[in-house]
Amino acid sequence: MAPNALSPVDIENMNDAAIEQVRLQVSDVIDPRYDTKWNMLRWLQSNDFNIPKTVHLLKKHLKWRKDRKLDEPESQSLLQFSDARRKHAPIDIIGPQRKEDGDRLVVVDRAGRIDVSGLMKSVQPTEYLHEMFRSFEEIQRRLMKMEAETGVQCYMHYIFDLEALNFDPTLLGVVNGPFRVSWQLVGQHYREFIDKFIVINSPSYINVLWSALSPFIPEQSKQRIVFAGSNWKEELLDIVDKECLPERYGGMIPDIQCLKPVDPIPKSLYWKLPAQYPTMDQLHKVSVSASKHRMLIYKVDKPDTELLMYSHNENDITITLYYSKNKNVSENDLELAVAPIPKCGLPAMDLFDYNCEYPGYYYIKLANEASWLLPSTYRIIVIEKESGKELEPLNLNEKWIKKGQKSKKK
């Protein structure tokens, strides 16, 4: 050790001091069930121990946890479900990598066998993302349990199996669209989970996929991605006990005990407009020029008003929700209610539900950041859940909004 190098004890003491500073500043919003040393440390690590930045981002995350009731029993969570995602694109949580004192959780994603085309025709953007959040909430519960038992920070080894992946013209669009966006949003909320992201059974065209995806991956994350070679079973057994791996990966656990089947999606699961949804013609069409944004303004009169936001977009667009007690304020003075959500174009109409905790003005910002040349159209209608009536934007008469058709009275 160099003469001026910090000892492990010094580093731990510095970590503990930083953790206490963060804990003190979020004490009014954090749920005791989430308040662990290791959860605090993960947020600090992901923000290079910048305490103000950590506190700012963690508070946003904690508000999101509260809004979706993620610290309550899982049955009370307000995350949406996706049967297609859960049953036909499952993530399998195997368990710790060691029989004793394991500090890495083994997770398997058999992405190569997923019916990608069928999945994209079956899911709504928000429910697809929420199903991923559900998986990562379970991973987080497992990590927290391991940390309570071992007394050390735990991570996961994420085995990304591309066996049977077929190249088709839509694959690049999915990789660069829904796949990339969903992982970016997962990364916003679940910090420092992955120790190694291990890609096995890579196809010959993996370089094409990597070229499309790599520009969007932070350098720190790239260092954790491992492209295993033809001897990947030996590589896995170097970091995971044989007793802790499924048989197909060189282990001893019968596959049927730990790996869910990955079957094609039947056409009966393809998305169809539910009877209680508005029709596509009823949604207002908002035109957003390339590299520009639009702002829709809504007035909410009562606290705890639940809004149902139905939307559809054919091209990538980013949506952000802001709040203000007053109407005429600059964007810089608005309070962030929901962090920016990139939304990819999918066939299904999306449903995003949001509880307006306070009365006042809510601003939906639509940003066409992905396009340099072409405008994008975003269709949207907002319904008050309790009354079932539309909440119209105050600026509905702007020339860049084409009003949707009124629903016919029955």
From Swiss-Prot:
Residues 81-257 form the CRAL-TRIO domain. CDD domains: SEC14 (cd00170). It comes from the Eukaryota. SMART domains: SEC14. Pfam families: CRAL_TRIO. InterPro entries: CRAL-TRIO_dom, CRAL-TRIO_dom_sf, CRAL-TRIO_domain, CRAL/TRIO_N_dom_sf. This is CRAL-TRIO domain-containing protein F28H7.8. It comes from Caenorhabditis elegans. The lineage of its organism: Eukaryota, Metazoa, Ecdysozoa, Nematoda, Chromadorea.
